[in-house]
């Protein structure tokens, strides 16, 4: 999919660059593969904001995407490629030989009419899924599982991918887009290819209203708030915050290391921060 730029006939169209989605399916999604979504406005069960800058936006139906790909050795044909409002990647509707329909993440270079299959060892072809134990080293993959059978969790956003770079005692080594080198069990599944819609990050939405349609609210600076709302808030007139930049909860926000270590850190061979100064 290419980018589409617009002539500045209105202020909202000046600088507007969007993805050309003319080749995608224009109808509604498959009814049995969608469910309703209730808007939370970024609040949790106690009513507190746990995710800032969320709220409003157009109504959505959630498309149930198969991230597990555990239907082994049953070929499926791609019926159509669809837009999914819940993610940056496109999704593909596939029909298995036994008649079952499913949505999968659409990789780059997957077209309508192509055949995909999941199995213990399959062809290295976009859309095919297999565990790392049956995969040749050097393969570009996406939708990578962290735990066998849990479903893909890594490399699912538009244009992302990981590279299978080696094996080591029951583990597969993968290099992620961020530069991180990590291990996962060889029984973990991954899908061949890079995720579709690589130009997603090159879009320019042109006006605030388009982001509001997507459910994104304005970002307010801490120094513009009251003292109750943010450590940088308050003061007479404009202030610089009066302290080193912090988050609303008082943690350093300009590079201070604040993350706790966790058990799975031992599976990270090289951190994505390895090249940073002082790391």
UniProtKB/Swiss-Prot annotation:
Annotated region (Disordered), positions in chain: 224-279
- Gene3D superfamilies, alphabetized: 2.30.30.30, Nucleic acid-binding proteins, Ribosomal protein L2, domain 3
Compositional bias, Basic residues, is annotated for: 269-279
Q: Name one GO molecular function term.
A: transferase activity
Q: What does UniProt give as GO cellular component?
A: large ribosomal subunit
Keywords in alphabetical order: Ribonucleoprotein, Ribosomal protein, RNA-binding, rRNA-binding
One biological-process term from Gene Ontology? cytoplasmic translation
Entry keyword annotation includes Ribosomal protein: yes
Subunit structure, briefly? Part of the 50S ribosomal subunit. Forms a bridge to the 30S subunit in the 70S ribosome.
Tell me the function of this protein.
Answer: One of the primary rRNA binding proteins. Required for association of the 30S and 50S subunits to form the 70S ribosome, for tRNA binding and peptide bond formation. It has been suggested to have peptidyltransferase activity; this is somewhat controversial. Makes several contacts with the 16S rRNA in the 70S ribosome.
Q: Which family does it belong to?
A: Belongs to the universal ribosomal protein uL2 family.
HAMAP family (UniProt xref): Ribosomal_uL2_B
Query: Would you tell me the protein name for this molecule?
Result: Large ribosomal subunit protein uL2
Q: What lineage does the source organism belong to?
A: Bacteria, Pseudomonadati, Pseudomonadota, Alphaproteobacteria, Rhodobacterales
């Amino acid at each position: 999919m290419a980018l589409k730029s617009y002539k500045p006939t209105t202020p909202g169209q000046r600088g507007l660059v969007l993805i050309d989605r003319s080749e995608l399916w224009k109808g509604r999604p498959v009814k049995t593969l969608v469910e309703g979504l209730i808007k939370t406005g970024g609040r949790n069960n106690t009513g507190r904001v746990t995710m800032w800058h969320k709220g409003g936006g157009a109504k959505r139906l959630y498309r149930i995407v198969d991230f597990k790909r555990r239907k082994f050795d049953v070929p499926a044909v791609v019926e159509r490629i669809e837009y999914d409002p819940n993610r940056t990647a496109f999704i593909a509707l596939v029909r298995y030989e036994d008649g079952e329909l499913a949505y999968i993440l659409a990789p780059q270079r997957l077209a309508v009419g192509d055949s995909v299959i999941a199995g213990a060892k399959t062809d290295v072809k976009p859309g095919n899924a297999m565990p790392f134990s049956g995969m040749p080293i050097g393969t570009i993959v996406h939708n990578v599982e962290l735990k066998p059978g849990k479903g893909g969790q890594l490399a699912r956003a538009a244009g992302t991918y990981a590279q299978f770079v080696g094996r080591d005692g029951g583990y597969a080594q993968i290099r992620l887009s961020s530069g991180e080198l990590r291990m996962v069990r060889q029984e973990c599944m991954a899908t061949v290819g890079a995720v579709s819609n690589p130009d997603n990050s090159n879009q320019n939405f042109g006006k605030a209203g388009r982001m509001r349609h997507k459910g994104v609210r304005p970002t307010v600076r801490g120094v513009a708030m009251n003292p109750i709302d943010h450590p940088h808030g308050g003061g007479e007139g404009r202030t610089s915050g009066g302290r080193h930049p912090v988050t609303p909860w008082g943690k350093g926000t300009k590079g201070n290391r604040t993350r706790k270590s966790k058990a799975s850190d031992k599976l990270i061979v090289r951190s994505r921060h390895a090249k940073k100064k002082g790391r």
